[in-house]
Structure formats: structure tokens, C-alpha cells
Amino acid sequence: MLPAHPTTAPAAFFLHGLESSSRGTKGQWFNQHFPAVRMQDYHGDLEQRLAQLEEQVAGIDNLILAGSSFGGLMAACFAARHSERIRRLILLAPALNFTDYRPPASPVAAPVLLVMGSRDTVCPPDLVLPRARASFRNLTVRIEDDDHMLHRAFPALDWPALLT
């Protein structure tokens, strides 16, 4: 049953990539190290996945969304529509270069950590960065010596601080 009033404690969610699931590498990592991070499997196109996310977070404010690749695109789109509900975004090689994405008219004010791999050929930093800068007012960028999967950079992030 959903709460009668939106929650005020931060609630963290992991949004997986297009070809991944909650049981992928990052999902398993969260299950082991931060089991309170909520996740589910998303299916369909961007709008269908956003509708699934809307259902998942119904009645919850103070959201921390960590999204990988297409999940990062989902997090950015959700934040553009509901910026008042966002505490923080952690965008991991987000697919902001996909044609489905347009920066919001008013940049999202919540803190955003954008982590990209310098060797990412799926979501190259030179294509993602301009859209990120147009989308987020409080943006921190980390470009790591990594590829799209961010297997080295991902576990090295300060997750205890990011998830509070």
C-alpha cells in the first residue's frame, strides 16, 4: 500500500540500462553493498519505462536516482518533469546523446554527478556533455579512464555519501 503522504526520507533507486536488468553487474553490486537501493526491471521504449518508474516512485519525494546508460536517460527525463522531487542524480554514462532526449526548458537544480568513461563509444563525452550542461544547473562531471560499462569507476565512487 502506498503512503498517504509523500515520504521525506531520501529514497534511492537504481535504473539499469537498455540491454541490462536489475540483475546486471551494477544491480548485483548494489544488492551486495547497498541493499536498501530499490530497483526493478524496466521494459519497452523510453515513455513506457518512464511510466513504470512513475508507478515505482508514486508517493515518494526526496528521490536519489542512479541511472546507468539508458537508465541515466530515464533519470534525466524524470528529473526534468519532476525536479521538485529530486534530491540527487547520479548519471553513469547516461544516454543523453540519444535522439529521444531534449534538455529541459528550465535546468534541473538538484545536484547531479555525471560519470563518464573517456573511452565510451556508446555515449561519448563530447556528445553527452553539452546536453548535460544545458540540462543541469548543479552539475559535477567526472571523466574516468574507463569505457561505457564503467566497471572500474563505478565501485570506486563514494556511494555512502551519494546515497544520503
Question: Predicted regions: what is each one?
Answer:
Residues V108, L113-M116, D120:
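Short beta-strand/loop motif that positions the catalytic acidic residue
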Residues H151-T164:
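Post-His helix in hydrolase/transferase enzymes
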Residues E84-N97:
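A conserved short beta-strand
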